[in-house]
A protein has these predicted regions:
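Short coil/turn segments at secondary-structure junctions
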Residues: 14-15, 112, 183-184
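Alpha-helical support elements that line or immediately flank enzyme active sites
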Residues: 34-41, 96-120, 146-159, 201, ...
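Terminal-appendage/accessory-domain detector
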Residues: 1-96, 187-194, 201-296
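Hydrophobic alpha-helical hairpins/lids featuring a short glycine-rich hinge
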Residues: 80-135
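A generic short alpha-helical patch detector that favors 3-5-residue windows
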Residues: 2-3, 98, 120, 141
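Glycine-rich, mobile lid/loop segments that gate access to catalytic sites or pores
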Residues: 115-198, 212-213, 217-218
Length: 296
């Protein structure tokens, strides 16, 4: 079976009960780190061009921006801005850190669009991030976030396995290697997040992607298929976290300090993200990012 088929089967059947606690814990920390970075970037206007473009695109009221009271925008536009906000402040030294700056904005945008529960969003983030982690280069040089983002979007849109495979295959057409350094921070991640949602929507509308697209990418990257899919569902490439030795209490305190603004609102935001698996929606989390960014 092609690599994309293996991941499509796995992702469509994945539930929160299948995910070990250490994986959920590590993902929760990455989500907290990403959102805190996005709030900080929003507060200082680090990627205002992305916000202006997203608001200009507008579209149907589907998803909100991190740290901005701009109302609801089309999900691809929101993912573009949120991807740049998270990517601009990324300080995670992990080689796969850039992938979360794509997968999470996609999951937030599509999650709000389809009114997904928190546990559904968490599963989508983990599924997309696991795919990205298995394909990523140690130095982060491969642009794999769009592939994980497409998988997360397709999962939240409840596409069947064939459409999930198509979404990832279409997203493969957006994979490209960096052409240099410099320029506006977070740009690549934001564009990848928007493209991931477009890929999933194309698949949902009947567009097809190359059935063996991931296999071709693996060959071009000199990755063995057996290595990419080995232990899928039993072994987790996304489990390791650089702050694993830090207690949750200390990690949350450090995150509150990074968030700044009202200490009460910062604590509330951390608590909401920690309880993501039990949340009825994402609305309160996005609303709190606006309050924390404004410092009110």
């Amino acid at each position: 079976m092609p690599v994309s088929g293996e991941f499509a089967d796995w992702a469509t059947e994945l539930t929160v009960r299948h995910i070990p606690v250490p994986v959920r814990r590590a993902t929760g920390r990455r989500i907290l780190t990403a959102i805190a970075g996005g709030v900080g970037a929003a507060r200082v206007g680090l990627v205002d061009p992305a916000v202006h473009v997203a608001v200009g695109i507008g579209g149907p009221p589907e998803a909100e921006l991190i740290g901005h009271a701009a109302g609801r925008l089309a999900a691809p536009a929101a993912a573009l801005a949120n991807g740049m906000l998270i990517g601009a402040a990324r300080s995670d030294p992990e080689g796969v850190g850039a992938a979360m700056a794509v997968v999470l904005p996609v999951a937030l945008a599509v999650g709000q669009e389809v009114k997904a529960r928190g546990d559904e969003v968490l599963v989508a983030v983990i599924a997309g991030h696991e795919l990205a982690c298995r394909l990523a280069a140690p130095d982060g040089s491969r642009s794999v976030g769009v592939l994980g983002g497409a998988l997360a979007a397709a999962r939240l849109m409840t596409l069947d396995r064939d459409r999930v495979r198509d979404a990832v295959g279409i997203a493969g057409g957006f994979v490209g290697e960096p052409i240099g350094t410099g320029g506006t921070v977070g740009l690549a991640g934001g564009i990848a997040a928007g493209n991931a949602i477009i890929a999933a929507r194309l698949a949902a509308s009947g567009a097809s992607g190359p059935a063996c697209g991931l296999d071709e990418l693996c060959r071009s990257w000199r990755l063995r298929r057996e290595t990419v899919v080995a232990g899928l569902g039993a072994e987790w490439a996304c489990e390791a976290h650089r702050a694993a030795t830090v207690s949750d209490y200390q990690f949350d305190l450090e995150t509150c300090a990074r968030l700044g603004g009202s200490r009460r609102d910062a604590r509330a935001l951390v608590a909401e993200v920690r309880a993501l698996a039990f949340a009825p929606s994402l609305d309160s989390i996005l609303a709190l990012t606006v309050k924390v960014a404004a410092g009110t």
